[in-house]
Each structure stands twice: as C-alpha cells, then as structure tokens.
Amino acid sequence: MSKKKARWRKLDNAAKLYSAASNKKDTRVFRFYCELKEEVNPDVLQEALNQTIETFPTFLMVLRKGLFWHYLEPCNLRPIVKEEYKEPCSRLYIKDKKTLLFEVTYYKKRINFEVFHVLTDGTGATEFLKELVKNYLYLIHKVNGLEPVSLLPEDMTVQDQEVDSFLKYYSKDQKRPEKRKLHAFQIRRKKKDGNHLHVHESVVSVQAVLKRSRELGVSMTVFLTALFMMAINEEMSKMQKKKPVVLMVPVNLRKFFPSLSMLNFFNWIEPGYNFTTQDQSFEAILKYTKEFFETELTKEKMSAHISELLALELHPILRLAPLELKNLCIQAGAKYSEKNTTAIFSNMSAVKMHASYVPYIERFGVYTNTPKFELCLCSFQDKLSFAFTSRYDTVNIERNFYRLLKEQGIASEKVKPEFPKTDEPSEQEMKVYKIYSFLCIAIVAAMLVTEYNFHPRIRWTLFTAGGVVTMWISSSIGFFKRYNLLKNAMWQLFIGTIICFIWDALTGWHSWSVDLVLPIMSVSTLTAMFVIAKVRKCPVREYLIYEIMAAGYGLILPGILLLCKVVKNPTVSMFGALICFLFLVAVILFKGREFKEEMQKNLHV
C-alpha cells in the first residue's frame, strides 16, 4: 500500500450529523472486537497497533471547530493500548479536549476497537480491526511459521482512504419522491440503574440461519428483520399497535458504488409494519419485508437518497449559518427523527481473514451506543454474533427474538458477559463546582437582601454582589474550558472586557474600561497565549488561530471605539492596537502558509 501523511479534511455528510448530535449519553461510539483463543499480550498488541496506524494514518485525527463546520486535523498523539477500564462505547470525543477519536483496549482474550462514528463507519472499523488482529497474530506466531499476508489492495493510497464518497457520487439532478413518515411505536421502559449500557450477546450458526433463509426464499437480513419486528410486536399493547414498528437498517453503499474510502459511506432503509392493519402471520410479514428490500435496495434509490442528504448540506444559505446554529438545528432534527423509528438493526456482514490466521480466532462481535434499542450482528466462519444494546430494561424483546429463532429451527447460545469492573467517571469536580455556585448564589442573595433592608449609604452590598457574579462567570469559563487553555484565554478576554464595560456603565461611565482595560487585556492575553504555546511546545496549527483571534479583537474593537470617539484617552488604546497590528503582520509575513491554511480550515463552508 502506498503511504502518505494524512492532511486536514472536511467532515463527510454523516460525520457532520454525528459531531453535532453526540453527547455524554448518546456518544455515537461503537465497538468492534475480536475474541481470540489465547490471552492477549498487551506489549505485542501495542506493537501491532503501531504498525496498523502506519497503514491507516487517516485515523490519527482530532476533531476541531471552525466557524461554519467541524473538521478533522492530523495530530501528534499516538494511541496507547490499555486494559479495558470503562463502560463499553463510552464517550471518546470531549469538547475542547484534544483526544483521538478511537481507542484500543483488551480484556483476557478479547481485543476491543472503539471508534467515534465521525471518524469512520462499520466497514472502515472492520478493516482497521482486521489489520490490527492480523499484525498481532503475526507478531505472536511468526516463530511458529505464520506467514505475513496483505488484507488490503496493494495499490491503495491514503488519498483513497480519505475520499468523501458522498460527494463523489452526489448528483443534484437525482431526486427521491417525498414520503410522509408516520410516527413509529416507541419502546419505553424504566431506565436501568445509573443509566448504564445494557449489552446482551448470543451466538448462532451461520449455516443454520442461511439454510432456513434459503428455504424461505429470502436473504439472511430480510429473515432476521422480519423476526425482529415480530419480537417487538409481542410486547405491544392493543393501543400501541396503532403505530407501526419501524426499523432503521443501515446499508453499506460500497455495495452499490465502488469505494475504498475509510470515511463514512452508508445509507439506511426503514422497513415498517403495522400489526393492526396488516396480516400478522409470519409469512405475510416476511413477504412484505422481502418486497420492501427489493424495492428500496436499488442503486437508483440509494443515489437519490445521497442527493437528498447532500442537497441540504450544500444549500448556499444554510452553509453560511454559524456552526453553533447548525448544531442546534441538527440536534433538534435528530431528536424529532427519533419518533420515526422504533429500533435499529445493523448487519455488519461477514468478517473474513486469511485461512492461516483463522485457527487463532474464536469470533468477532460488534455493538454500539445508541439512544434506541439496537440489534447488531456480524459473522466469522460459522459463528453469527448477535448483540442487543440499549439503556432500558427490555430483555423481553431479546427473549422473544431468540424464541422465534428457535421456532424456525435455529438454536442460540448465550454469551456470558465478560467485562472488568470499570472505573466510574468521577463526579467530584462537578460536585465542587455546584457547591461553589451555590455559595456564590447565597452571597449574592444575602447582599441583595441587605441592600433592600438597610440601604447602606456606601452601596458596598451591590459592589460585593457584582464582584461575586464577575468572579463566578470568570471561574465558570475556566472550569468548562479547562481542557483548552488557549480557548479559555480567548473566552476570558471576550467576557472579561464585556463585564468591565458593564461595570463602567453602571458606575457612571468614566471610560476606564475602553481606555485601559480593553487594550491591556488584549495585549496581556496575546502575550499569555504566546507563552503557553511555547511552554507546552504546541504545533502551530493548535495555537495560531487563537492568537489571530486575540490580535484581531485587540485591533478591530479599539479601532472602532476610537473612530466613534468613545475612547477619551487614546494613548494606551493606540499602542495596544499597534502591537496587535504588528503581530498580525508578523504572522502573515513569517507564518503565511500556516495562516492561509488556518483560514481555510476555520472558514470552509
């Protein structure tokens, strides 16, 4: 494979949705794992991971925010193999914190690969894990004569991995007829204690499922989709059956459009069945599901859906909306669209390894963190691994599903869950912050009550209350932006000057906030950023945009105030603006290429 360093890149269509909609509970992280027949050696696994990253440099990315969109940027971070230490599919992307978007852990005989959906999809994750497992097994067993093999095309390049296939196959002339979506039945159960992810796995024979599917004249996915809808239906009341059971079924678009991309490239279909108005027999449900798949799984339908998704993203007016506004709209849209589906059924298909490596592998498995009830499956050799995940007590649906499989002559074997005792995320920091906030509120309230009852001649109560509010705002910014000191400094500059403007106005406007505070804070912040970047040895791409913002703020705002004659004593303002101006000139002259790249990344639409 041809190797070349990855560069910064725009997010693909699906990644833009995931970056906006992910949160602490809905992490948009999924796990692909490999169960070996021997205990994992962590040192060898680390060496194998280092080799795998050389093959897939596109994974060494961090998520950054621009003015209009997020983007992915190469970083000098390297993944470190750890023993499994937290709940599966926990959050990988933490706002403002520079972290990789994937993680490799191990537990006993299992190698886990967890990844944020912004980085890749199921196909990309499969290829990464296969390469990792291959490298690991070779390093362990080469002394026994195991030969090195290649799992990827020899002429595959990094550019192939980075292709945005959504854009490649987008055609603005393709349009899909609009369908009115009905609200689907929603699975609602009491949440588990602590809102932890609930994972139940079982294994069945691939040949048994294929044999029965062929007897019925349908594909494996159609067969299992019909059973899944029936399993859900059995838990619905008569009133609930007025709404259809609708499944979201992801579709790998590489089966329709040639692509070697490691980015997201998938679509979905939504088979739904109303068990009140339609025949409830298995034969009728299977027939409907088969016809639905045959109708929807065509190249024309997939192409039209791609065009529909991209048309919204590429709308000239919507593209110019600020990122934060886009995020709010995407989050609202994602919340609303949840009403259109009951559950998710994701078939990752068969994982294939070179024959010489097969004897060392027990099976592969996959599951994901989702706000919905989800069934994921993948196969290896004759083992088909099922994984039900949710944050609700919904074991009845799983029980129904496996019973229906048994009625079709397919036995299942429950997998005993093997997870270490995880480190619960510490809430101590947030508790301290809440106590601090309560004390600040108490002091402000006490000052206001004192002011109302005693009317002191020198209004020290109001000054004290204002000072406490100012201190709380400043420290809150520091707390929530603690992962990024440079962004923290920029926020402190922006909020700090605004607070000073307000104080100046409330005390009779003596102009000290614009004459002194604004230029001094701007230059001080710029200096602090420079020192932080040097001390921490930050790459240019990590600090330059913040220094440009601080210098621009210290130049443009005082300039406007000088022109409007708001500044009474212009000396300090002019010197501050001069320093900021010279800094920007120096950046353009000595860091021109980096300056241009930062502008492209942060202003791309």
Regions found by a protein language model. Give the residues of each.
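Central hydrophobic cores of alpha-helical transmembrane segments
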Residues: 226, 489-496, 544-554
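Membrane-helix interface and helix-disruption motif detector
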Residues: 444-466, 481-487, 502-521, 539-542, ...
